């Protein structure tokens, strides 16, 4: 499952992202964040972190540097 999700994200990065433009307000970009989170924490926890990140990605959020956490703790 982890490999499948990372492959889908890479396909998005190479096929769709160039057409949509690079407008991510965060560093690393949301797709790079997703690959890192899934690679570190697996499909389920990585997807959870990615969904939380995508919910913050909107015009009213200032953005900035938002790395994947080193370890998951109580939040």
UniProtKB/Swiss-Prot annotation:
It comes from the Bacteria. It is found in: Cell inner membrane. Keywords: Cell inner membrane, Cell membrane, Membrane. InterPro entries: Membr_insert_effic_factor_YidD (IPR002696). Its main location: membrane. It is a peripheral membrane protein. Disulfide bonds: none annotated. GO terms for cellular component: plasma membrane. The keyword Membrane applies. Could be involved in insertion of integral membrane proteins into the membrane. Belongs to the UPF0161 family. This is Putative membrane protein insertion efficiency factor.
């Amino acid at each position: 499952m982890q490999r499948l999700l990372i492959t889908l994200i890479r396909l998005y990065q190479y096929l769709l992202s160039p057409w949509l433009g690079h407008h991510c307000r965060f560093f690393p970009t949301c797709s790079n964040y997703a690959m890192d989170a899934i690679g570190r924490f697996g499909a389920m926890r990585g997807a959870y972190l990615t969904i939380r990140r995508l919910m913050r990605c909107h015009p009213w959020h200032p953005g900035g540097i938002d790395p994947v956490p080193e370890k998951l703790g109580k939040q």
